[in-house]
Amino acid sequence: RTSMRNQLPCVVTAVTAVAHGPMVAVDLRTPCGQALASLVTRESADLLGLAPGLGVLALCKATAVAVGPTVEGTTAQAQPGTGCTLQGVVADVSPGLGAQEVALTLPSGHLWVGFAPQTEGLVVGRAASGRFAPSAVVMGLAS
């Protein structure tokens, strides 16, 4: 168990040392083929034995995910310097003060939860994207 509601099985596609630093960029592929990225320390990468082909569980706090409408013609992306974007369809919207919690159904059927300003106009059934920093993606070994 964990308090992180966003949990997605992924496969490592690349592990790249970040120049002049203790960080490692890890490229991941989701079950629906979308790309994710994670930044971890070299020590963490070694402890997990991260290598292409390894199955991992990618986790991310809902509070780290900014949800907004999907812009026509954009695709899912994952770049360590600029961030990650997962695309899905709004499954649920829970209003709150100033922000609303939004659950996205990804093409794989998994849910990805984040927050959006009330002004985004997100409604159930509408295409939307969740954006978050690679540093917010935690990995665990899949069992």
Describe the predicted segments one by one.
Residues 19-27, 95-103:
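Short aromatic-glycine-enriched beta-strand elements
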